[in-house]
Amino acid sequence: TNAHCSAPGCSPSRNALLYGVEPYKSGLYAFYDQDKFSKSQLEDYTSLPEFFKNNGYATFGSGKIHHRRNPTPVEWTEFYDHKAEKRNPMLFDDSGYRQGNSSKMNFKPTLNPLEDHNDYKNASFGTEILSREHAKPFFLAVGIVKPHLAFVAPKQFFDLYPDPVKPPRIRVKDHEDIPAVGRAMAKLKDDKRFKSDGAWNEVRRAYLACISWADHNVGRLIGALKASPYADNTVVVLWSDHGYSLGEKNHFRKFALWEETTRVPFIIWDTRDQNTKEARVIDDGVSLINIYKTLADLSGLKTPDYVDGFSLAPQMLDPSKPFTKPAICSWGRGNYTVRDKDWRYTRYYNGGEELYHHLNDSDEWTNLSANPKYAAHKKRLASYLPVGEVPMVKKGIETWSIPVSADKPLTNKKKTTPESTKNN
């Protein structure tokens, strides 16, 4: 796809999508424990499930929807919280890899039955909701956690990848034309550790296993929908909160403004459209911020005035229809990237820039920002950058540092400088 998140991190991406407001307008740039917010910080926003509940829908949820927010009756008619259950310990196979002593850095198959895994339970709740008879319209959100770290999944999904995983194309000196802020985001320490341990293959294999495990559970949900009375009267949206780098640009995880970290899977399936035999593909840069207005539009509802983005319903019928604006993604205040059909332009808080022409450079190896030949493209894309931006919301923030933000560095146990950031 050419779809992109609003921020390459779980919390800010989900906040933007679920509240319908870009980080540079809400101040929710980073990771937050929402249950510690004062009400005034969120009272101006109506979350997507709350919006549908206010409009007469029954709302059901399970798994990871918000990042670190406990389910509330304001949003949910019913929410399945697997964390409240007693969990069986994961039994790991001897194969795979573990980095250090952190449980989050496990890249291993488990020997537990499928039913022991939280994602299986999350999907099972969704299939049960689809089997019910509903008296009124309903909104169902199922948050499949994998492929989030740790990369652990049932062994049968690791067995799908017995051979060495083909590595991505990597340029050794790729960072030479990248501004210092971008290099700080890259967090080269993970890449160096995996290389020194000879572990990159196991890391990538574990990621693929987790993807297949997620696909399995999504398939269970789709199967339940097709077997239900709602098979031809439901809008299905598949999305992920951010992309993931597995060595591209010598980078691991997300938390950067490059293609692999901002690009996401994104599918909208309107089962009411019985005339469409083949999928329609939108080539323009699409932002997840548009989900709120799109779902409201397809449901015949009007969104709150503050909601950002635009409805994709016209483009779903005709992908050639022009877009209002390309996808914009931010990571920390003052750091933005703009992605349209063929180009990516990035500007950091201190003026550092990157420009890539994806028709010729899908790996983003050659930064064209200093080349006067491409000044017009840079100027056009820069015109979409925010004119104003609000400061970071400070209260309730976790111990987390956005690399080289325009705001003062957040308090950390370790000192944060413009050339360094805490490794997460």
Predicted features along the sequence, with ranges:
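Formylglycine-dependent sulfatase
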Residues: 1-348, 353, 362-386, 397, ...
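Short arginine-rich
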Residues: 390-392
